Design a protein with these regions (language model features):
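Conserved alpha/beta-hydrolase
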Residues: 1-10
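Alpha/beta-hydrolase active-site loop
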Residues: 13-32
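Glycine-rich phosphate-binding loop signature in dinucleotide/nucleotide-binding domains
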Residues: 30-37, 127-128
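Short, hydrophobic alpha-helical segments
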Residues: 31, 186-188
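Alpha-helix termination/capping residues and helix-transition junctions
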Residues: 33, 58-59
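Gly/Ala-rich beta-loop-alpha elbow adjacent to hydrolase catalytic centers
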Residues: 43-51
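Active-site signature of alpha/beta-hydrolase-fold catalytic machinery across serine-
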Residues: 53-57, 150
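The alpha/beta-hydrolase serine catalytic core
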Residues: 61-150, 154-161, 166-185
């Protein structure tokens, strides 16, 4: 599935509430359509943030969770990396800012405020330690590995650092390492 404003989704404005609604719908669909014995989640970057927020609010419906380069400090990433001073000024004046990589979408001040209010770094995920694996590239240019190290340590989560991998794991050897570790973790 695609998160709101990602992939084939047609929503023009990004909200965290929509992410929660979409993930709930996907889980309900999977349960009704396939009646799986177990459900695993594999998310990258924002997908990692969104599932962590979901787990904090609803508990974990997953037997295993694998996160690659999770954006655990998303508010900081938006304000320090994605948004320009011009974007931040627009948001302060109540206007939308347009963000995104391949696909552009709108955010408003409420979205940025909701990121600050939902600071994943402040939540306790230690209850999920046995069912969660984080993998992160040591050369990630988008989500600082230091933030993820602090998050993993605080919550006693397993973190595998993939030497030389960037945020997108563009190197096929690094991606292969990630895929193999993911499969091993989910099926162990």
């Amino acid at each position: 599935f695609d998160w709101p404003c990602h992939g084939e989704d047609v929503k023009p404005r990004f909200t965290l509430a929509d992410c929660d609604t979409y993930l709930t719908a996907v889980l309900e669909y999977a349960r009704e359509r396939f009646a799986p014995e177990s459900i695993s989640f594999n998310g990258t970057s924002f997908g990692g943030y969104a599932v962590l927020k979901y787990m904090h609010e609803h508990g974990s419906p997953f037997d295993s969770v694998v996160l690659r380069c999770p954006a655990v400090n998303l508010h900081e990433i938006f304000t320090g990396l994605y948004l320009t001073e011009n974007d931040l000024d627009k948001l302060r004046r109540g206007k939308d800012a347009v963000v995104g990589f391949e696909k552009k979408f709108k955010i408003n001040r409420q979205f940025l405020d909701s990121l600050a209010e939902n600071d994943i770094m402040q939540y306790d995920f230690s209850a999920f330690a046995d069912s969660m694996l984080i993998m992160h590239g040591t050369r990630d240019e988008t989500v600082p590995i230091d933030a993820v190290r602090r998050f993993a340590e605080k919550n006693d989560l397993m973190l595998i650092e993939i030497n030389g991998a960037d945020h997108m794991f563009k190197d096929p050897a690094r991606m292969s390492e990630y895929v193999n570790d993911t499969v091993d973790f989910i099926f162990s």
